């Protein structure tokens, strides 16, 4: 598909996820179902690095809703709740950041997140590096 054509119909939400190769087909099928239920007129484009388990998703909701926060929430839920059922990660290669930090628990256990916080506090005791990008400390 042509990226310019896809991006010409905003809003377009981009996602970067990773999951086991054996789960790819099932995840895409389940995502099509979840996204289709949330946005019957929406369009889903899937690109990626299938050999390493990374997918790039371009979601165009085409929603009649005027509430951009509600549209984004529904799009995020369709991607990440489906991803959780397939034991995927919310970021394949583009990091967590503010957009994904509320979904980090899907990819990492509470123990792993606690360790990440501890490392952050140890390496950045004054919290000046990337404040609030992955989690609040």
Where are these regions (language model features)?
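A glycine-rich phosphate-binding loop feature that marks nucleotide/adenosyl-phosphate handling sites
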Residues: 47-54, 93-103, 132-137
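C-terminal substrate-recognition/cap domain of FAD-linked oxidoreductases
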Residues: 1-75, 82, 86
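Alpha-helix capping/hinge segments and adjacent helical runs
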Residues: 84-96, 125-129
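Short amphipathic alpha-helical interaction segments
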Residues: 67, 71, 75, 96, ...
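Activity-critical C-terminal alpha-helical subdomain
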Residues: 101-137
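Hydrophobic, well-ordered secondary-structure elements that form the walls
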Residues: 57, 79, 94, 124
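Alpha-helix-loop-beta-strand connector modules within alpha/beta enzyme cores
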Residues: 77-79, 118-119
